[in-house]
């Protein structure tokens, strides 16, 4: 198992500095992580720093962290991020619409990003800690229907992160051909392995180095 190649090495806090992005990218190249996951304002810098190695992708977040932008705004964010060098897109779905049962809006929201991405890989963030199990299942079904490539547990900025139980449910719902990303609270090798054993194919974490070296981090993301 190439664990490093399953990790999105992440720095999404509001106070993230240029120096921290430089360190993040240097570490991603050294450990050969799947991607760096950064806020849209840092995409161009990350793309420049990683241009020597196409294997490390530049992932960014859309409608983050609330998911409460309109589909049109999320589509523009997506196009702008790709123009700036993003090669993977993690979007937050419309959580309020899902809770309201407005499933047509949820699907349209996801589809708007998928279409704007135009072939660039799209992951859909659910924020499972705010959802019932049935809502998680519905979100997964709508993500597949709208053409997303991955489903993802959490932003890391709400009341809870990834759980083994939720990863199993998401994997069972989407089947074998869609990626499942565990994010939020994965801090060490044991935690990452538990998520992978449950069906995760990607781990989002700021604790990537601790995970691959057998250490432990106190990071919430």
Curated annotation (Swiss-Prot):
Gene Ontology CC annotation, any one: cytoplasm
Active site, renumbered: 90 (proton donor/acceptor), 152 (schiff-base intermediate with acetaldehyde), 181 (proton donor/acceptor)
Gene Ontology biological process terms from the UniProt entry: 2-deoxyribose 1-phosphate catabolic process; carbohydrate catabolic process; deoxyribonucleotide catabolic process
Pfam family, one: DeoC
Key words of the record: Cytoplasm, Lyase, Schiff base
Catalytic activity: 2-deoxy-D-ribose 5-phosphate = D-glyceraldehyde 3-phosphate + acetaldehyde
Phosphoprotein as UniProt keyword: no
Pathway: Carbohydrate degradation; 2-deoxy-D-ribose 1-phosphate degradation; D-glyceraldehyde 3-phosphate and acetaldehyde from 2-deoxy-alpha-D-ribose 1-phosphate: step 2/2
Primary localization: cytoplasm
Gene Ontology molecular function terms on file: deoxyribose-phosphate aldolase activity
Enzyme class: lyase
E.C. numbers: 4.1.2.4
InterPro entries: Aldolase_TIM, DeoC, DeoC/FbaB/LacD_aldolase, DeoC_typeI
Localization per record: Cytoplasm
NCBIfam families associated with the record: deoC
Record's function text: Catalyzes a reversible aldol reaction between acetaldehyde and D-glyceraldehyde 3-phosphate to generate 2-deoxy-D-ribose 5-phosphate.
Family designation: Belongs to the DeoC/FbaB aldolase family. DeoC type 1 subfamily.
Name of the protein in question: Deoxyribose-phosphate aldolase
Gene this chain is encoded by: deoC
